[in-house]
Structures are given as structure tokens and as C-alpha cells.
A protein has these predicted regions:
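Alpha-helical scaffold domains
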Residues: 1-99
């Protein structure tokens, strides 16, 4: 259980950075997309929620990041892993609402 919350904490920090920091270049956030893709395959509920939050917040940074995160969300939504599908679909719903 401890590792689950440590892993979630990393994703939550990324979400908070994206939500509360202005002026960070897209390239800084783009580096974390492979990490988000990797984290989305974790079946643990709290980790999934952390990844979902981070992906959604990073995607709201700029139009370019929305496109990049949207592509990742579409890829995850088609995954054969249930956790990745959930993260992808959740992010796509958020991006549709925020248009």
C-alpha cells in the first residue's frame, strides 16, 4: 500500500505543477508524457487517479499540450489494459468539456 501512495504522489506533484505554474514551456511537460503512459498501466486505483489528474492538468496547459495529451489519451483509451483505458477515457471526457 505504501508504494501505491508514493507513486501517486509523484503524479499528483506533476498535476499541481501544471495547475499552478505559469510560463513553463511545453517541452518541460512533454518530457513526462512517456511517464504518464507508463503509469496509466498500473492497476492500483489511487495510482490511476493520480495519472488521470496529471494527464488532464498537463493537457490544459496550452493548445499544443492539449493536442499531445489528447493523442496520448486516445492511445490509452484503445489499450488492452483496463487501467489505461479508464485513464484515457477520463482525460478525453475532460478535454471535450473544456473546449
Amino acid at each position: 500500500m505504501k508504494g501505491e501512495f508514493q507513486k501517486r504522489a509523484g503524479f499528483v506533484l506533476l498535476a499541481c505543477l501544471a495547475a499552478h505554474s505559469d510560463g513553463i514551456p511545453d517541452e518541460q511537460f512533454r518530457r513526462y508524457l512517456p511517464v504518464l503512459e507508463w503509469g496509466a498501466t498500473d492497476e492500483r486505483n489511487f495510482v490511476q487517479k493520480g495519472v488521470s489528474w496529471a494527464l488532464r492538468m498537463v493537457g490544459l496547459q496550452s493548445p499544443g499540450m492539449r493536442r499531445a495529451c489528447g493523442k496520448l489519451a486516445q492511445k490509452l483509451a484503445k489499450s488492452d489494459r483496463a487501467s489505461a483505458r479508464w485513464v484515457g477515457k477520463e482525460a478525453l471526457r475532460e478535454f471535450e468539456r473544456k473546449r
